[in-house]
Amino acid sequence: MKRTFQPSRLVRARRHGFRARTATVGGRKVLAARRARGRKKLSA
């Protein structure tokens, strides 16, 4: 059985990146929550 984590910078950015977050209402809520918490890094 192969490992489940097959790193890809492009896929990571497209799925969890800033633009992916801002594209949906839920994603914007995630960003707002992370801002409220004072996270240094908002997205991947």
Swiss-Prot record:
Keyword Nuclease: no
GO MF terms, alphabetically ordered: structural constituent of ribosome
Record keywords: Ribonucleoprotein, Ribosomal protein
InterPro entries xref list: Ribosomal_bL34, Ribosomal_bL34_CS
Pfam family, one: Ribosomal_L34
Highest taxon of source: Bacteria
Family to which this protein belongs: Belongs to the bacterial ribosomal protein bL34 family.
HAMAP family: Ribosomal_bL34 (MF_00391)
Protein name: Large ribosomal subunit protein bL34
Organism: Novosphingobium aromaticivorans (strain ATCC 700278 / DSM 12444 / CCUG 56034 / CIP 105152 / NBRC 16084 / F199)
Lineage: Bacteria, Pseudomonadati, Pseudomonadota, Alphaproteobacteria, Sphingomonadales
